[in-house]
Amino acid sequence: MGTIDIITSPTPIHILAFPFPAKGHINPLLHLCNRLASKGFKITLITTVSTLKSVKTSKANGIDIESIPDGIPQEQNHQIITVMEMNMELYFKQFKASAIENTTKLIQKLKTKNPPPKVLIYDSSMPWILEVAHEQGLLGASFFTQPCSVSAIYYHMLQGTIKLPLENSENGMVSLPYLPLLEKKDLPGVQQFEDNSEALAELLADQFSNIDDVDYVLFNTFDALEIEVVNWMGSKWPILTVGPTAPTSMFLLDKKQKNYEDGRSINYLFETNTEVCMKWLDQREIDTVIYVSFGSLASLTEEQMEQVSQALIRSNCYFLWVVREEEENKLPKDFKETTSKKKGLVINWCPQLDVLAHKSVACFMTHCGWNSTLEALCSGVPMICMPQWADQTTNAKLIEHVWKIGVGVNKSDENGIVKREDIEDCIRQVIESERGKELKRNAIKWKELAKEAVSEGGSSYNNIQEFSSSLLFN
């Protein structure tokens, strides 16, 4: 298939992109926007007022950014995660109402400019935005930031094959087409938000509520990773796998695309401690560092933080641990200032892609969010799986038992706490054992397959070409 390039077009096509306002959802869609922008499309990223306050730029290397109100009181804008944890159902209700009203106004404003928007790519967790797009005469593209395997489970939840709440799944075992046999603990979990679990589960299942009306269905995955499930879903809807949507510069691919992302300024919309952590990693030998991060939303208990910190110290390995500022008070007393400095570095955030690509990183202790999973896979880094909620539990199952690129911890007490002994054992399995060598070989294999998918002629490359062509000639 020939390369689609509309840079020389006198009137570029205008694409709107609206990710759910969380880092793990914004970044993958932003990276897809980068690829589309490199083909000459005009891109406008829509985000919320509170998100815009936390980003480092209002224009990302040629991608315009527009903000809309969150729908929550202004004084709580900086505490969006806390608001979600307290009453997720109320948050989503307010956000939905605000997003529908203000996205409509924004599209109407942008339609008066040249070029007017033609398509709205939106996060699949916001299916109600499709109606806004169609009412305003735009095409709608649903972008799934989770694997097809997890999406298939949510679809079966919507169909009633899996009953809500998930805790009532019969015998705790689920058998679904083209998926491994799943225990109850492998199903997408929402236990972290106990008071909101049913509301969240329904929200996730609703991703498929109007999928038959969507003009495009885009998945941040690649064919080789989940070929049977991709084919099954493709028999129902015209899906396009376009992942991994990590920056193509990390694969050292197309020069034009790499130049477009030169300096990596486009890779991160949010501020990162690049200099501090990269200098620290440069001082470590190859495969000696455990990178630890549990994402932008997951919240560990104080007891769990204690178990993780003790396991890291007892492993006698170097470690780089990302702990969000609002979570720091859960660390053991003086851990960041004294104990950890002997072997580790604790920071609030970091350039995760650069960290995972660094030669000193031996493994990744992760919550198994899909964004982090793909970034580790693309970097050829084995994982220690410590899932918290939502799709992470299923991702962990796939990482350990299907793709065989990681080991999973056991929640060994009644409170779901992972003990330090179990974490230590996982660290030693990945870093010191023969199994660890096998995990590394598998990780490198999947890294190469991911590179093939986004390279010219690969499945995801061709699907992005197909999407681009459709917009050009539709």
UniProtKB/Swiss-Prot annotation:
What are the EC numbers? 2.4.1.-
- Cite the InterPro entries for this sequence: UDP_glucos_trans, UDP_glycos_trans_CS
What SUPFAM superfamilies is this protein classified in?
Answer: UDP-Glycosyltransferase/glycogen phosphorylase (SSF53756)
User: What is its EC class?
Assistant: transferase
- Quote one Gene Ontology molecular function term: quercetin 7-O-glucosyltransferase activity
Key words, A-Z: Glycosyltransferase, Transferase
Residues annotated as binding UDP-alpha-D-glucose are: 296, 349-350, 367-375, 389-392
Family that this chain belongs to: Belongs to the UDP-glycosyltransferase family.
Name of the protein described by the UniProt record: UDP glycosyltransferase 9
This chain's source organism reads Catharanthus roseus
